[in-house]
Structures are given as C-alpha cells and as structure tokens.
Amino acid sequence: MKLHDLKPAPGSTRKSKRVGRGHGSGKGKTSGKGMMGQKARSGPNPYPHFEGGQNPLVRRMPYKRGFTNRFRVEYTVVNVGDLIEWNNGDVTPEALREVGLIKNLKQPIKVLGDGDLNVALKVRVHKVSASARQKIEAAGGSVELIDAAA
C-alpha cells in the first residue's frame, strides 16, 4: 500500500467547513468571498450578463425580426445568355465549372432566362426557370433536371 492508494472508508462523510469563525480557521473575516462588492453581500448574485446598470448588450442591439428557414436551398445562378459561347452541346455542372461560370459543384444550379440563345444545347441542371426553358427549347435544345443530391 502506498500513500496515493489511501481512500476514505466507504460511507464516511467529512464535516463541512464553518466559515466566518476567526482568522485561524482559514475562512475567517470575509468567509472566502473576497473583498467588498455585490458578490460579497448576502442574497443572490446578479444574473450572468448583468453589466452593472449599464444598458445591456442584448438591449443595445436591434431586434432580429422574421424567421430563418434552416432548410433553404441556395442555388448558383447561371443565365441563358451566359451559355451562348458554348460550342459543346452538353451543359452539365462539371462543364460549367471547367468554363468558370460556377465555382462550387456542391451547390445546386438554376438557369434563369436573362439573355438570348440561338444554339441548340442539352442542358442538365438542378432547376430551370420557365422563361429559360422556353428559350432553350425554342433554340432546338432540351432541358433535363438532375437530382440535387447527385
């Protein structure tokens, strides 16, 4: 048996330290509460974000109004007019990335109808606006929607 193996007997309890009973006890005078101040007084302490009567940070900030949908899907937008320079007939997320029209392949892509199109393209994206679909099909192309998880 060594000193670090010593343990109190099972079920034994230690007497609580009596505070405020003289300097010799080690917990005399201020009873472990330090010097003056609100925390040294009897009764509850001020709440955690209390700033001493100054207008609190929570009240200095403007209201956050409205609601944020956690499941909102952010789309990378590509316009029909951006696809004009396309020589290749297939428009896919990978091809758009190579050309530099999009940066992130993880974000789904939506094609919008701004601009004109006179080349037949096979467009494979996650979403297409009605006007973009109309312009692509009018130019002799086709639209195929792909799953967002893919």
Swiss-Prot record:
Origin species: Herpetosiphon aurantiacus (strain ATCC 23779 / DSM 785 / 114-95)
Family annotation (PROSITE patterns): RIBOSOMAL_L15 (PS00475)
Name listed for the protein in its UniProt record: Large ribosomal subunit protein uL15
Family: Belongs to the universal ribosomal protein uL15 family.
GO terms, biological process: translation
Gene3D superfamilies: 3.100.10.10
Function: Binds to the 23S rRNA.
Chain intervals for the UniProt region annotation (Disordered): 1-56
Composition bias type Basic residues, residue spans: 14-26
InterPro entries reported for this sequence: Ribosomal_uL15, Ribosomal_uL15/eL18, Ribosomal_uL15/eL18_sf, Ribosomal_uL15_bac-type, Ribosomal_uL15_CS
Assembly, per entry: Part of the 50S ribosomal subunit.
Upper taxonomic lineage: Bacteria, Bacillati, Chloroflexota, Chloroflexia, Herpetosiphonales
NCBIfam families: rplO_bact
GO molecular function: rRNA binding; structural constituent of ribosome
Domain of life, source organism: Bacteria
